[in-house]
């Protein structure tokens, strides 16, 4: 009995995969490394022991007490003591430290006399995440320090602790960070960052698997095995990669949410189905791009750029809604953008299908453009006019 073209192409692709080490590296090693990398990069999930410096121009018991209070803040680690601000500022510019606290000369004397004085802090804000942490920690520290003289005088006058607190803090606040109460970076970034990496790998692997047929002059054999049916040729060729990357996605979700215990408000089925949909949509995008630019050397550069743009426009580190309007609308041309929106819905509330059906539909729509361009892809493979473009 004659073997079906689909099975024949599938077996042919499996033979190609096991005969070339690049497929093992890109389909197995890179995703596994990405899982390990994203599971460990954030450590305990918070920024701690950031190097800062101190400029102590007062050299008194009060200034030394302030330095001890600064050292007690988990965010900081005082690595340098400076004689003047110029040297400290130079180290901030060199990123040897991320900020410094300046205690002016005569600070203790002014505090004891009840005169106004100031503690100044400087921090490197070009690195926004680090700068925000340094700024917040300094703000909290100096708020505590600023009330110490008042408390000392009030206690000396015989005022009890409750009256002092009601005077200094007439209004108290309660802070309740939703979905991430520990302010853990890994809770928000680990899973989407992995899939940002994965979509870049997917784009490159998919275009390489198709483009290498032309590069190594095997496209005629590929089509012949598929009995001239380009739909069978493409789907059977990509099926092993779909299976491998979906398995890697499921493994990643298990590691992140099962082993690392990152909190989520949905079940594994919803996460895994969304991940599988991202894999298929990204492969469809890669086929579409290759059909438009069927030259191997050109398409690798194009999909690398598209993968990088997808990482930027995924909305993981900066809200896309606040980007330039044309960029915001362009972000929906990338599957990873829809995946991130679905993931945020599932992980941080599981608000229901009504809030994410649009993104699911968009991921499914990515399957249509490559189908329309399959005839063009077949003609380019038969003509072989793009095979030798460098």
Model-derived regions: residue spans:
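Selective transmembrane-helix segments that form parts of the transport pathway or gating/packing helices
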Residues: 228-255, 360, 364, 368
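Membrane-spanning alpha-helical segments of multipass transporters and channels
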Residues: 59, 251-255, 263-390
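Hydrophobic alpha-helical transmembrane segments
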Residues: 129-146, 179-194, 212-224, 245-253, ...
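Long, hydrophobic alpha-helical segments
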Residues: 190-209
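Alpha-helical membrane-protein architecture signal
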Residues: 3, 7-11, 183, 187, ...
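Extracytoplasmic/periplasmic domains immediately adjacent to an N-terminal transmembrane anchor
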Residues: 1-186, 380, 387-390
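Transmembrane alpha-helix boundary and packing residues in multipass membrane permease domains
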Residues: 40, 205-208, 253-257, 287
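Juxtamembrane interface at the cytosolic side of transmembrane helices
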Residues: 203-238, 383
């Amino acid at each position: 009995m004659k073997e079906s073209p689909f099975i024949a192409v599938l077996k042919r692709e499996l033979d190609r995969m096991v005969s070339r080490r690049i497929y093992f590296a890109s389909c197995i090693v890179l995703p596994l490394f990405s899982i390990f990398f994203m599971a460990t990069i954030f450590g305990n999930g918070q920024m701690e022991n950031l190097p800062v410096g101190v400029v102590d121009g007062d050299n008194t018991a009060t200034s030394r007490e302030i330095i001890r209070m600064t050292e007690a803040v988990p965010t900081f680690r005082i690595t340098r003591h400076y004689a003047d601000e110029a040297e400290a500022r130079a180290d901030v510019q060199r990123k040897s430290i991320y900020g410094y606290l300046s205690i002016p000369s005569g600070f203790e004397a002014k505090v004891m006399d009840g005169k106004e004085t100031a503690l100044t802090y400087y921090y490197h804000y070009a690195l926004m995440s680090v700068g925000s942490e340094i700024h917040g920690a300094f703000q909290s520290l100096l708020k505590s320090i600023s009330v110490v003289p008042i408390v000392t005088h009030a206690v000396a006058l015989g005022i009890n602790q409750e009256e002092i607190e009601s005077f200094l803090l007439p209004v108290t606040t309660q802070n309740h960070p939703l979905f991430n109460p520990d302010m853990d970076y890994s809770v928000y970034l680990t899973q989407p960052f992995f899939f940002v990496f994965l979509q870049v790998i997917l784009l490159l692997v998919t275009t390489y698997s198709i483009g290498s047929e032309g590069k190594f002059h095997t496209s005629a054999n590929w089509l012949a095995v598929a009995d001239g049916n380009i739909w069978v040729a493409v789907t059977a060729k990509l099926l092993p990669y779909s299976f491998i990357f979906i398995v890697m996605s499921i493994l990643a979700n298990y590691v992140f949410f099962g082993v690392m215990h990152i909190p989520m408000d949905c079940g594994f089925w919803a996460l895994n189905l969304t991940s599988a949909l991202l894999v298929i949509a990204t492969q469809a995008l890669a086929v579409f791009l290759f059909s438009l630019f069927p030259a191997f050397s050109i398409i690798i550069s194009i999909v690398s750029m598209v993968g990088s743009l997808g990482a930027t426009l995924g909305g993981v580190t900066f809200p896309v809604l606040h980007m330039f309007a044309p960029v915001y609308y362009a972000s929906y041309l990338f599957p990873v953008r829809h995946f991130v929106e679905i993931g945020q819905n599932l992980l941080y509330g599981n608000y229901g299908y009504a809030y994410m059906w649009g993104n699911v539909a968009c991921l499914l729509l990515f399957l249509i453009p490559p189908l329309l361009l399959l005839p063009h892809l077949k003609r380019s493979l038969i003509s072989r006019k793009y095979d030798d473009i460098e």
